[in-house]
Amino acid sequence: MQVDRIILKLNSKFSNTISTWAAGSCNDLMQLSDRNLDVMSIDSLLIFNQNQVLKQDVQELRTQFDKYQKPILHIDINGTLAVGKSNLDLWIERNKCRSVLIIGADDLVDNVNLERFLNSLN
């Protein structure tokens, strides 16, 4: 991923997985608590899900980004790998994303498609 900063929510299994993956490819990796998340200081929101299901906390955060007209992308890890990867690349390029908040449910960690998708980005 060609972004300057990846922002993750603190203390979640999903964030820990993304943090491990991003450690080698991102210079600036931040983990913030919910109360320290400032939507105005983040360029965009990347949501990982499976089968288009969004948890309540993810939906609330999405609503905040919508309110400020920030770019949002959903990646369904059970979808086609090539389509998801190319959509992500185009989204980052088109929206000039520099800082991206990446969120997803903790149960995604158990889905083998998450690891497969992340490995395809390296």
Tell me what each language-model feature is.
Residues 2-99, 103-106, 110-118:
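Acidic/glycine-enriched connector segments
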